[in-house]
């Protein structure tokens, strides 16, 4: 709100060849002056896609952690489903103090795995019995049908300060995950402790219950989604989760999906002993008729507005629209890009003229 600009910047590392790589986070003041720059990357480690600023001035970033296929196999990955390049990329989250250049908290998917392939491994167990863990043998294939090293490809991150929880989106597994942020370094690697008593295990997941053997392909509700977020307090639908539900090979159209997570009073999530996490159906969807007229197979974003409408960023083609709860379009804009750059938008946000950050630039 003070007029600063905060976000990622490109410091590419050629050994991570996947969409969304950045390797740098920056903050600029209202006059365009660089306040700080943090580079996050190396031969086997790189920040990518998204960041979120915390109230304490630190930020959360998504990072890749690259290991060999052999190491993934040691963790229970099926040798028949490793990428041809001989690598396996775990996703993680770090909290960084940009002034001390220090990682003050971290989490990695590599510590929260289950598999039912090799009974000798420590993480062997029934996948359906452990919805709080990630089956290392869930697989993603790219548009050419190849299994990729970029396993989960987290593409967005959000933080809920009231619940002290982190929300991330895995389009490769067609799921959103929520984890506890109030854990010690040991607790974040384990299965106990923290505010919710589950350490760094998943508190909640939604979108594709087949990933934890509590559903089938017919139960899938997210398809390559982007920009998962909690609707902020004070806005219509506050506390719900909103996401751009892209679609793809399984579904050649997009929707905007809003869900009401099954939240207990203490901030934990309801789940039946043998069923998938709810809800069974979205609380609201924007799904134009015919559906094929609204489709972006990659990037894209969404934002709930104070008037109850929703700003939709159709990333492929760079089309913005504001839609009502009834699906009526009340405003549209087509971004033309610059020069020969293809027309695409990763994300867009709308700010009112009296937003404090804008007033900082005009007064």
Predicted regions and their residues:
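Histidine-/acidic-rich catalytic cores in large beta-rich domains
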Residues: 1-363
């Amino acid at each position: 709100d003070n007029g600063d600009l905060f976000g990622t910047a490109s410091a590419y590392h050629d050994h991570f060849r996947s969409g969304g790589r950045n390797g740098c986070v920056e903050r600029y003041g209202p006059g365009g002056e660089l306040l700080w720059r943090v580079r996050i990357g190396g031969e086997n480690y790189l920040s990518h896609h998204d960041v979120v600023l915390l109230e304490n001035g630190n930020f959360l970033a998504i990072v890749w952690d690259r290991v060999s296929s052999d190491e993934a196999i040691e963790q229970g990955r099926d040798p028949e489903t490793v990428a041809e390049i001989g690598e396996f990329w775990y996703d993680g989250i770090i909290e960084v103090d940009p002034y001390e250049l220090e990682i003050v908290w971290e989490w990695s998917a590599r510590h929260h795995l289950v598999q039912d392939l090799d009974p000798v491994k420590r993480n062997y167990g029934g996948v359906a019995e452990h919805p709080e863990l990630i089956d290392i043998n869930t697989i993603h294939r790219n548009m050419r049908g190849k299994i990729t090293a970029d396993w989960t490809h987290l593409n967005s991150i959000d933080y809920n300060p009231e619940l002290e929880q982190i929300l991330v989106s895995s389009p490769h597994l067609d799921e959103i995950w929520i984890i506890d942020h109030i854990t010690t370094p040991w607790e974040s690697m384990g299965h106990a402790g923290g505010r919710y008593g589950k350490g760094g295990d998943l508190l909640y997941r939604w979108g594709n219950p087949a990933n934890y053997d509590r559903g089938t392909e017919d139960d899938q509700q997210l398809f390559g989604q982007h920009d998962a977020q909690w609707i902020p307090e004070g806005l219509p639908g506050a506390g719900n989760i909103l996401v751009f539900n892209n679609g793809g090979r399984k579904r050649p159209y997009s929707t905007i999906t809003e869900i009401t997570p099954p939240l207990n009073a203490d901030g934990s999530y309801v789940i039946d002993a043998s069923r998938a996490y709810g809800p069974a159906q979205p609380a609201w969807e924007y799904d134009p008729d015919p559906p094929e007229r609204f489709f972006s197979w990659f990037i894209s974003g969404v934002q709930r507005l104070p008037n109850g409408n929703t700003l939709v960023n159709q990333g492929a083609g760079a089309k913005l629209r504001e839609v009502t709860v009834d699906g009526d379009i009340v405003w549209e804009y087509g971004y033309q890009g610059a020069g020969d750059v293809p027309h695409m938008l990763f994300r867009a946000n709308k700010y009112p003229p009296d937003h404090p950050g804008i007033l900082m630039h005009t007064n």
